[in-house]
Curated annotation (Swiss-Prot):
This is 3-deoxy-manno-octulosonate cytidylyltransferase. CDD domains: CMP-KDO-Synthetase. The lineage of its organism: Bacteria, Pseudomonadati, Thermodesulfobacteriota, Desulfuromonadia, Geobacterales. Its main location: cytoplasm. NCBIfam families: kdsB, PRK05450.1-3, PRK05450.1-5, PRK13368.1. It comes from Citrifermentans bemidjiense (strain ATCC BAA-1014 / DSM 16622 / JCM 12645 / Bem).
Length: 255
């Protein structure tokens, strides 16, 4: 009988933010944003436990106040992956899920969808999600990361540029082509799942040329020859980068 794998969701949370300082503690209907993320992650069927990883005592205190588990991390980490690797090194888990701390509307089913490839195939070190692009604005926006993959779901590339480039239709791109599915393209959903043993490998890799060009850390994995499995999801969330994004979250929760 195969041993049941222990799967831990880790939520990296910082207080400092250039566009929205203290957003992890932003009030959403009486609870801090980090609590919303924590509670939704805990509802994922495949997740055994949830941990908030932070270097800020204000966030740690808020997590403890609602009964959550918190791990304090070094304040010198340059990336969320480094913070994740520090926590992974001292907890008992087989699979680590990196749940973004600014996704208060994340659906627990999305987390389960991203985990399953690692349960089905022991050779996969890392997995993530994608969803269909349905507007021309998203397709053209450098703030929306596009992704292409092979027929078996292995990522080929992530980019801030339009991807793929529809050469024959470029001068006649319209929203309805994306809505109808005539033009199929996907945006990356920033939820990552790792085998625990892969995290220190990833964190130990040097930044790569394409990673630095696109400012996309996950390209470091591809440039070093590792596979990333990607799964399409029907669910969409709202990342909170600004106070205006927070207003959108509140509107959806109230509506």
């Amino acid at each position: 009988m195969r041993r049941q794998m222990k799967i831990t969701a880790v939520i990296p949370a910082r207080y400092a933010s250039t566009r929205f300082e203290g957003k992890a503690l932003a009030d959403i209907m009486g609870r801090p944003m980090v609590q919303h993320v924590y509670e939704r992650a805990a509802k994922a069927t495949l997740v055994s436990e949830v941990i908030v990883a932070t270097d800020d005592e204000r966030i740690a205190a808020a997590v403890r106040a609602f009964g959550g588990r918190v791990e304090m991390t070094s304040p010198t980490h340059e990336t969320g992956t480094d913070r994740l690797a520090e926590v992974a090194a001292r907890i008992d888990a087989d699979i680590i899920v990196n749940v973004q701390g600014d996704e208060p509307l994340i659906d627990p089913a999305m987390i389960d969808e991203a985990i399953r490839p690692l349960l089905d195939d022991p050779s996969i070190p890392m997995a993530t999600l994608k969803c269909r692009i349905k507007t021309l604005h998203d397709f053209l926006s450098p703030n929306v990361v596009k992704v292409v993959s092979d027929p078996t779901g292995n990522v080929l590339y992530f980019s801030r540029s339009p991807l793929p480039f529809f050469r024959d239709k470029w001068n006649d791109l319209k929203d309805d082509a994306f809505v109808s599915g005539k033009l199929l393209c996907y945006k990356h959903v920033g939820l990552y799942v790792y085998r625990r043993e892969f995290l220190p490998v990833f964190a130990g890799l040097q930044p790569t040329y394409l990673e630095l060009a696109e400012k996309l850390e996950q390209l470091r994995v591809l440039e070093n020859g590792y596979r990333i499995k990607i799964v399409e999801t029907e669910f969409e969330s709202i990342g909170v980068d600004t106070p205006a994004d927070l207003d959108k979250v509140l509107e959806r929760l109230k509506g």
